[in-house]
Swiss-Prot record:
This is Probable Thioredoxin. Its main location: cytoplasm. GO terms for cellular component: cytoplasm. Residues 2-85 form the Glutaredoxin domain. SUPFAM superfamilies: Thioredoxin-like. One of its GO terms (molecular function) is protein-disulfide reductase activity.
Length: 85
């Protein structure tokens, strides 16, 4: 099963580049086991509202918000590994 990762960001968010960087590292590590979608909440506000997000960056894994704020590499990799298993 492919794990779906959604990263919610905004252009003015100072922490969003860190979240994107760690997700990009995860994509390199896990390859085709994960599908990454980067969502700019200024463009796709509805999806953020559907998740009830009040802050960015936020990361949803398989439809569940798992992180608000930029997670550490180990935290994110562990959460992804849990979903793959």
């Amino acid at each position: 099963m492919v794990v779906k990762i959604e990263v919610f960001t905004s252009p003015t968010c100072p922490y969003c580049p860190m979240a994107i960087e760690v997700v990009d590292e995860a994509k390199k590590e896990f390859g085709d086991k994960i599908d990454v979608e980067k969502i700019d909440i200024m463009v796709d506000r509805e999806k953020a509202i559907d998740y009830g997000l009040m802050a960015v960056p936020a990361i949803a894994i398989n439809g569940v918000v798992r992180f608000v704020g930029a997670p550490g590499r180990e935290e994110l990799f562990e959460a992804i590994s849990d979903e793959i298993e």
